[in-house]
Amino acid sequence: MLGLTEDTFLLVASDVHSSDECFEKLEHIAGSTNCLAFLYAGDLDIENYFITRSVQLRNYVFLPVQGNCDNRWAWTDVNLDLPLYRTCEFKGLRIFITHGHLYCDPSSVGLENKDFDLVITGHSHRYNISSEIVDGKRITHMNPGSPARPRGCRASYGMVVFGKDSVSLEIRALEGDGLLAQETIAVDNASERHD
């Protein structure tokens, strides 16, 4: 089954650009009982009726940010806030989400990079997982790529999988369920994480 796992996970995507077919596949994954939330890093282009209706009727937690192609006012029709960036925490993993066209990390909006474990961006339409050390702390960057308009790579989306003893970042192919990239990260106080 496309992208499903027995562990709890976060679905990560960006740059769908009004593709009904791609969004429907992502929604199938987000609707899994193991999916804690659908983190969306911009450029959904919600003027599409199917996508608008799907977001209104969703049965999952949807946390989007505004991309350079999103009309912020169109999102008011579906009662969703569409900030330029958002922060959240799941099971001890501190996350910063932005599209990447204006901001690329927490420090660009006056926050401390070291306060986050994972930075999620979109915009480039190319998947990537990389890490850097900031003030002695490892910060991982994840770009899920684009399931609709990939540039020089396969159509993709991301998953943050919470295993018993680890957090795995995965980039998966939209078609064929292939694993394209993976990295395991440590979370401070991981043993103290709770649902």
Place the predicted regions along the sequence by residue.
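Charged phosphate-binding loop/patch that engages nucleotide di/tri-phosphates or the phosphate backbone
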Residues: 163-195
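Helix-adjacent hinge/juxtasegments
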Residues: 59-115
